[in-house]
């Protein structure tokens, strides 16, 4: 389960933001997880509380925003990809040579005590 190491990395990034803004702790964070990022959102949510224990994010609420995969079909342009099809257009079956979105793994929002920072 690599989600525990991902949770630790998110906690490190959030800790940097806390220090940068002189805040002692965060009460919530939002993470964007792409469908093609190889991250299991449920496993990340399960790992986060234990990883955050003893850090400024202990007790913080983790929200996970799932980002669908979108690929570029040579014939149909941007199409939403279905994992079970692989990187193929759902309309014609052609390979989608470029993933436009869906591989994200990013800290999007961090709520500090009485202060909210967006688009980190």
Swiss-Prot record:
Sections of the chain in a coiled coil: none
Alphabetized UniProt keyword annotations: Metal-binding, Nickel, Zinc
Binding site for Zn(2+): 73, 76, 89, 92
UniProt keyword annotation of Transferase present: no
GO biological process, one term: protein maturation
Gene3D superfamilies: 3.30.2320.80
Residue positions binding Ni(2+): 2
Top-rank taxon, per record: Bacteria
Pfam families membership: HypA (PF01155)
Single Gene Ontology MF annotation: nickel cation binding
InterPro entries named in the record: Hydgase_Ni_incorp_HypA/HybF_CS (IPR020538), HypA/HybF (IPR000688)
Role description: Involved in the maturation of [NiFe] hydrogenases. Required for nickel insertion into the metal center of the hydrogenase.
Entry's family note: Belongs to the HypA/HybF family.
PANTHER family, per the entry: HYDROGENASE MATURATION FACTOR HYPA (PTHR34535:SF3)
Protein name: Hydrogenase maturation factor HypA
Organism name: Deinococcus radiodurans (strain ATCC 13939 / DSM 20539 / JCM 16871 / CCUG 27074 / LMG 4051 / NBRC 15346 / NCIMB 9279 / VKM B-1422 / R1)
